[in-house]
Curated annotation (Swiss-Prot):
One of its GO terms (molecular function) is xenobiotic transmembrane transporter activity. It is a multi-pass membrane protein. Nutrient transporter. Involved in maintaining the osmotic homeostasis of the digestive vacuole. GO terms for cellular component: vacuolar membrane. InterPro entries: CRT-like (IPR013936), Transprt_Chloroquine (IPR017258). It comes from Dictyostelium discoideum. It comes from the Eukaryota. One of its GO terms (biological process) is amino acid transport. Keywords: Amino-acid transport, Glycoprotein, Membrane, Transmembrane, Transmembrane helix, Transport, Vacuole. This is Crt homolog 3.
Amino acid sequence: MGSDERKPLLSINDGDDDFNHQDVSTKTPPIKKESLSNKFKSFLKKSMTKETLPILIYVLLYIISGVINVVLLKKLMIKFVNYGFFLSQITNYGYLPIFLVAMWYKMYCTSDVPKETRNFPQYKFVIMGLLDAINGFFVVIGGVSTSGPLQQLLNQAIIPFTMIASFIFLRERYSLFQLGGAAVILGGVIVSLIPSLVGGSSGGNILFYNFFYLISVIPGALSNVYKDIAFQSIDMDVWYLQFWDCLYQSLFGSILFPVNNWLPPPATIKFTEIIPSMRDGALCLGGKNTILPIFNGTTSTLAFGSCGINDNFVCDDCHNTWIIVLIYMTVNIAYNIFILLVLKHAGATVYSIANTVILPLTNIFFSIHFIMGAATTPFSALSVAGLLLILFGLGGYRIGSMIKKPPPDSKKDSEQQGGEGGAGDGDSSDNKNNLGDSAEIPQQIQPKTQLHLRNQFFGRLGIDIPESRYRATNIINN
């Protein structure tokens, strides 16, 4: 046996050293795994296109303006704690000049307000303004003695109440996901109210006014449903609608002052005190305190009957109130503009997700002492539990809304159309067969119906549209 034969198999040299060397040297180096930071950067580069970047900016600005809007409104309620009725008038009449100028421009400088819109029955605006006035009255008067986090949780009750109103007046039907989500939302609202039910007045909450605030969702839900009924067959300009709604809302809001005569403190206003209360509210708007503490001359303690002794009679703190009012009105207008932009460019699904994000963010801001000062509301176990339940219920409701099922009525209509066309469409089916199996008749694009355009319009306004009605118009258009 030669020396080569005694070598191990892998050591045999057949003169291919150059080949083996070349083969080893040309092997592909091992692929390095991309780091998470690089993956994130590449994802951002692919996502940040000219189309998606504006949408992301709109959504972020909507969330930011929404949080600021809620926080500023609560700070205004704290400033006007003794003048809740005056605050409700400011939040109504303050927007009238803005909407009037915008409507005038739309009517006389553009063609956005046609004759059909101008001839729209005024009584429908009156009913809508009445419902919105009652809603705003309950929100402001009840919100003065309801903490910021609890306000945001109670606001979510409008979803189940709107479902009930839609079921009664529109005969709307809902899926099990939507019904389950609404039930969980109501459970979260009840859990959030437990501290007030058990502990009475605490954390700036007064039980009576917590329920007073909660009642506001009833006229709010009725307003949503009425808007769906009243604007059944017309596409209306946003600014035109906002002006008339704001006008009638302000007028009806002004005549609601007798209700304060029977309300407990701090919202009590006797009939003879309405004018002095409005005057003192105007002074508070200018930064002047009217209700001041009274001290004992000898002990330097608060005298009997002075403000500040209990939560039902609070001293004025009107410093820089007018600045907060101006900032709030500016942010509120921007907030409503971003609502339209998000709905227009991102759609209702992204809008719903953004609303869900706003809810926990506002509760976080209400717990920061630097922002809320003495009105800071720390987290509690029950408030966190209520928040989680409501978020879970909102998720279930949104999932149920996104599940598209053809409504039974549209299915029956299509079956009836097929049945009616069974005898009369024989010629058309024969003609189609004569063209051959491979021939296809081009599908014509059907024009959008007035109902479909109206639903799009209200979606941009942020008005809830029953899912089956919106899907029905899509089925007709498709």
